[in-house]
């Protein structure tokens, strides 16, 4: 039985992950972590998540929570995730990170911290989204430079980072397939007289509003035809189930930084 702890246990995603752990075979909730001073510290994590008493109280002691688990699932912020990754590395515990908004420098730091433990870092834990990553790579290679690429992502009005980590990863996948440097060709802003679109650029548009869980569409636009590859999240449960799947997979793996493509065997 894999002992799984959850960071951000009182949040929306944290609660759905707790439910997913109780529904998964071969996994059990061993700890629930929140920031120091959180008003729900001391509450039963299962009751809060709506799945009944689990006799696991929400704690603000990261060392105790990490010590008692095999793997920590973290959906917080890059700053907190790196702190948790460091704590797991010190105690030789695995970690699954679903936080988004990492800078290139933070990704490098994450890889360095994961040299001694197995860690999964993925902007999206959905099976469907990760299948889209594979499809995008194949489509981009086939179409080559004859099609312009534009990405549009939509999320709820509470999302803090833009564009989404999933949208950025989609752009990176396409850029890699086309032999381009994503950081040089990504275009996040068009306004006024900005000139003609370059052939190499990958456009990125962000929409925020209401309670949209997450929608992503990649447009391959050619002369007289257009291909659209879309994914729409109807519930957060696909993210929570994916994170638990990753948690069960990563325990016992060789040290290093993995992603959901590794978890799903898509590489």
From Swiss-Prot:
GO term, biological process aspect, one: lysine biosynthetic process via diaminopimelate
Top enzyme category: oxidoreductase
Biological pathway: Amino-acid biosynthesis; L-lysine biosynthesis via DAP pathway; (S)-tetrahydrodipicolinate from L-aspartate: step 4/4
Ligand binding ((S)-2,3,4,5-tetrahydrodipicolinate): 156, 165-166
Enzyme Commission number, as recorded: 1.17.1.8
Annotated residues for binding of NADP(+): 35
Family membership: Belongs to the DapB family.
PANTHER family: 4-HYDROXY-TETRAHYDRODIPICOLINATE REDUCTASE 1, CHLOROPLASTIC-RELATED (PTHR20836:SF0), DIHYDRODIPICOLINATE REDUCTASE (PTHR20836)
Its job: Catalyzes the conversion of 4-hydroxy-tetrahydrodipicolinate (HTPA) to tetrahydrodipicolinate.
Protein name per its UniProtKB record: 4-hydroxy-tetrahydrodipicolinate reductase
């Amino acid at each position: 039985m894999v002992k799984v702890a959850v960071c951000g246990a009182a949040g929306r995603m944290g609660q759905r992950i707790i439910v997913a752990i109780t529904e998964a075979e071969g996994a059990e909730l061993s700890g629930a972590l929140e920031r120091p001073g959180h008003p729900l510290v001391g509450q039963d994590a299962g009751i809060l998540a709506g799945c009944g008493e689990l006799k696991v109280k929400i704690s603000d002691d990261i060392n105790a929570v990490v010590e008692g688990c095999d793997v920590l699932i973290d959906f917080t912020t890059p700053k907190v995730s790196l702190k948790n990754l460091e704590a797991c590395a010190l105690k030789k515990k695995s970690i699954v990170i679903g936080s988004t908004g990492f800078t290139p420098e933070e990704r490098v730091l994450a890889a360095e911290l994961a040299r001694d433990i197995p860690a999964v870092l993925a902007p999206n834990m959905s099976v469907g989204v990760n299948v889209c990553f594979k499809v995008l790579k194949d489509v981009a290679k086939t179409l080559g430079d004859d099609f312009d690429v534009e990405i549009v992502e939509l999320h709820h009005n509470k999302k803090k980072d833009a564009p989404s980590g999933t949208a950025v990863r989609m752009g990176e996948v396409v850029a890699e397939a086309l032999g381009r440097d994503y950081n040089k060709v990504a275009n996040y802003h068009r306004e006024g007289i900005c000139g003609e679109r370059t052939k190499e650029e990958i456009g990125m548009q962000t929409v925020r509003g209401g309670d949209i869980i997450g929608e992503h569409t990649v447009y391959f636009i050619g002369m007289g035809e257009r291909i659209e590859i879309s994914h729409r999240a109807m519930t957060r449960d696909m993210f929570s189930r994916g994170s638990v799947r990753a948690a069960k997979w990563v325990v016992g793996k060789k040290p290093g930084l993995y992603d959901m493509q590794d978890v799903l065997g898509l590489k």
